Structures are given as C-alpha cells and as structure tokens.
Amino acid sequence: MTINRKPIFRRVLLKLSGEALMGDEGFGIDPKVLDRMAQEIKELVELDVEVGLVIGGGNFLRGGSLAEAGMNRVVGDHMGMLATVMNGLAMRDALHRAFVNCRLMSAIPLHGMCDAYNWAEAISLLKTGRVVIFAAGTGNPFFTTDSAACLRGIEIEADTVIKATKVDGVYSDDPVKNPDATLYRHLSYNEIIEKELKVMDLAAFTLARDHNMPLSVFNMNKSGALKRVIMGEEEGTLISSQASDEVIK
C-alpha cells in the first residue's frame, strides 16, 4: 500500500454528530471526547488542510423527537438549532485551548455569542487557515444537520464532506446487529440507493449527489482515523460518482 505524504484533500467539511460528543456521559458533552476531536482537527490544520465543521445537536435534544411528543415541529427544530450552537461554542473553546484559530458562525443571528453566517467571510477565513464552525444547521426547520453539512460543503467548495460515525464506514448491514456485515471501501451514489444503504437522510444525500460532492464516512472513535482519511489511506468508506465493488470482510 502506498501512503501519500501529502493530504489528498485541500479543503474539507467535517460533520460530527452531537451524540458522538456525549462519550460515556449519556447526555451533554464529554470533555475528553471534545478535547480529543480538537486535537485531531489540529493535526489537519498543521497539514495545511482547510477545515469547515458542522456539529449536530442530538446530545441535547432532537426537534423530530419533540414533534412526535406533540410539540410544534418548527419550535422543536428551532430548539435543535440552538443545541448545535451550544456544541459549536464548546468546540470553539476546545480548539482555542488547543491553540487553533477558529470562528463560529451561526445561520441564525446570535449577536454577542458568535458571528452570523457569511459565505464570503467563511471562504476568506478558511484560506487563512482558520477552522470555521457552522452552527444552527441551515437556519430553517425540517432540515437535518447532515443537510447543513452537505450545503455548507458545497458552498465552501470543499473537496469532500467527511461524516464521523461510531462505526468504521458504510456496511452492507448494521454491524452491531449483524457481525457478518461487510464494510465497503468505495461506493457510488447509485450503489447507495440500489443497495438501500443508510448513510444520511435522503435530502442530504441527494444534495451531495446532485452536486457531485464526495462523501467520506469514518469511525471517530478510532484514534488517527480522521488523519488517515485525509491522507488517502485505507480508512472508512468513500462515496462518489465512481462505482466500485470492493468490500472488506
């Protein structure tokens, strides 16, 4: 296997789930997980990779779950947006403590806490090596943070949207329930649909496919996995327009 000495991606959009930040806490944020992710992001910055970041809010609440309990969906989603801002504030602090310059931008105005999202300014910040955290989703209800990640990735012209998960990539079946499930190294957009594989919600996936935005899926709990994805090593699953049947037993 040939290992690239330079990153294969120049600019990336990293999507972290809110649940992943819980770690062993069960609710909220596990400081150890937060600091570890900040260090892994720092490694990318030191490789001159430009990093945009979207974090979910599921470690605090989910608008969809509140709607199922009877709350107005718009209100629930607004609360979910605020949860992503809380995670963004925490990550900004963790990155600053790791001596990484970053900026937090929110899709909804929150003067005094973070900047309002501005596409041109975000591009300028990325070019100067700052990490840009995009909070509050798309700023609209009924859209997931996966959709926000794909949207921001397309807007900032990222080379790939990297989704951090709790498993090693995209499997033929749920690896937790089925130990015989196979791990795919590379899939096309069409193969994802044909095999009915769950990567992200359909709106987000369709947005990425229609704009030919490659998707990378990796295990955020595996130390060094993010860097290996960036370096083009065999890690996780890459989803693009190119078809491949390669699987790892």
Swiss-Prot record:
Catalytic activity annotated for this protein?
UMP + ATP = UDP + ADP
* GO cellular component term of the entry, any: cytosol
Q: Where is this region: Involved in allosteric activation by GTP?
A: 23-28
Pfam families reported in the protein's UniProt record? AA_kinase
Could you tell me which InterPro entries the record lists for this protein?
A: AceGlu_kinase-like_sf, Asp/Glu/Uridylate_kinase, Uridylate_kinase, Uridylate_kinase_bac
Provide the binding site for ATP: 15-18, 58, 62, 165, 171, 174
Characterize the regulation of its activity.
Allosterically activated by GTP. Inhibited by UTP.
Top-rank taxon of the source lineage equals Bacteria
Report keywords, A-Z: Allosteric enzyme, ATP-binding, Cytoplasm, Kinase, Nucleotide-binding, Pyrimidine biosynthesis, Transferase
Enumerate the SUPFAM superfamilies for this protein.
Carbamate kinase-like
- MF terms in GO: ATP binding; UMP kinase activity
Q: Which CDD domains match?
A: AAK_UMPK-PyrH-Ec (cd04254)
Positions binding UMP in this chain are 57, 77, 138-145
What's an example Gene Ontology biological process for this entry?
UDP biosynthetic process
Q: In which pathway does it act?
A: Pyrimidine metabolism; CTP biosynthesis via de novo pathway; UDP from UMP (UMPK route): step 1/1
EC number(s) recorded for this UniProt protein: 2.7.4.22
The UniProt entry lists the main location of this chain as cytoplasm
Localization in the cell: Cytoplasm
**What NCBIfam families does this protein's entry cite?**
pyrH_bact
Q: What does this protein do?
A: Catalyzes the reversible phosphorylation of UMP to UDP.
Q: Which family does it belong to?
A: Belongs to the UMP kinase family.
- Subunit description: Homohexamer.
Please state what the protein is called: Uridylate kinase
Gene responsible for this protein: pyrH
